Structure formats: C-alpha cells, structure tokens
C-alpha cells in the first residue's frame, strides 16, 4: 500500500476542464520520466535522477487528480471510499494488491 497522506490542491487551478487537461499533461510527464529511467540502463547517476523525477511527476499526477475532484465536488469528496471500491474491483479482477 502507498500512503500519500493529505493532498493539498491549487485553489485557483482553473475550471474542471482545465484541471482535466492538467492531469493528462502531468501523466504524460510521468510517462516521459519513466522512459528516461528505462533508457538509463547502466548509468547509475541517470537512473537515480530518473527515479527522483518519476517520484516528482507522480506527486504532480496525484495533486492534479485531487484538484480535478476538488473542483467538481469541493471539500470532503468521498475519494477514500472510492479508492476502497477501486481496490475491491481490482481484487475481483484477480489483480494482486499490496
């Protein structure tokens, strides 16, 4: 299990549509960071830098996703309950959850 703690969102982050675009942009940046990690192979310094970048970009993805939810629902969104439901769906599909 990964615990991300409380996530602060950008108050003036734009409309829900703008926030949805931001989420896609951040996800693309996370994928690009992974590509750099995948290409680094035997360069330990590059691997270390790429690992840090992946972590930073994933944090941006989480922040953007929570910002989108907040822009639509505001306040206490029930996201914790939705995460539990998502976990159950994945388990029902035979995916091993850690």
What residues fall within each predicted segment?
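Flexible "arm" and connector segments at domain edges
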Residues: 1-98
């Amino acid at each position: 299990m990964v615990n991300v703690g409380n996530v602060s969102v950008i108050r003036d982050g734009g409309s829900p549509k703008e926030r949805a675009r931001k989420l896609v942009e951040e996800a693309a940046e996370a994928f690009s960071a992974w590509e750099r990690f995948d290409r680094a192979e035997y360069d330990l310094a590059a691997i270390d830098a790429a690992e840090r970048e992946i972590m930073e970009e994933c944090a941006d993805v989480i922040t953007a996703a929570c910002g989108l939810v907040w822009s639509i629902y505001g306040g206490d969104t029930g996201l914790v309950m939705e995460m539990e439901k998502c976990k159950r769906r994945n388990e029902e599909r035979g995916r091993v959850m850690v």
